[in-house]
């Protein structure tokens, strides 16, 4: 059985919205996009590379998939582009229909939670969820998240969409490992307690 691992860049106040670019996600007037970029270093790059090497597929929400599909195929000089292109990318959406334009992208049809359970039951390497906040919360509600890799950045954004929101089901996590980058980002790995 495969595990579902959620990997997220978050601020100290739990914001996960638009870590990579100013135009990545401007919903609700969010104007602080790209906040994680100044904290990137070799330690983070190595950790992310190791995580991607252990990944057998990506599971993305519609909005994150659309953002990635519009960005990554054009990043021809980025070493992560061929890795992302090669991975199967499953998209949880009730509005997207196949075939999807980004190579190896597949919409999950029918009930997304049932489809994710089927993916999880297959043999193979772990499934990584990147971004996709609403999907992460839904997976968590259904007991489908097996672990988190949280890149906790040393800044407070004061607003924006959060990984965990008020009203989310309480739950305990167990820290399995952590490393601190040269820029003060704590990369913490957790699994449900």
Located regions from the model:
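Periplasmic plug
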Residues: 147
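Portal/gating segments that form or line small-molecule/metal binding sites
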Residues: 1-144, 154-193
């Amino acid at each position: 059985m495969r595990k579902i691992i959620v990997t997220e860049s978050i601020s100290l106040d739990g914001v996960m919205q638009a870590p990579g670019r100013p135009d990545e996600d401007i919903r609700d007037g969010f104007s602080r996009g790209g906040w994680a970029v100044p904290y990137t270093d070799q330690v983070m790059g190595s950790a992310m590379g190791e995580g991607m090497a252990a990944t057998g597929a990506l599971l993305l929400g519609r909005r994150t998939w659309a953002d990635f599909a519009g960005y990554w195929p054009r990043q021809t000089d980025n070493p992560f582009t061929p890795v992302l292109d090669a991975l199967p990318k499953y998209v949880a959406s009730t509005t997207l229909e196949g075939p999807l334009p980004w190579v190896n992208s597949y919409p999950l049809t029918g009930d997304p939670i049932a489809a994710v359970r089927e993916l999880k039951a297959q043999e193979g390497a772990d499934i990584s969820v990147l971004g996709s906040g609403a999907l992460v919360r839904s997976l968590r509600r259904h007991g489908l998240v097996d672990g988190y890799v949280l890149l906790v950045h040393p800044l407070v954004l004061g607003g924006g969409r959060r990984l965990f929101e008020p009203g989310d089901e309480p739950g305990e996590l167990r820290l399995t490992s952590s490393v601190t980058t040269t820029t003060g980002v704590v990369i913490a790995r957790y699994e449900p307690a």
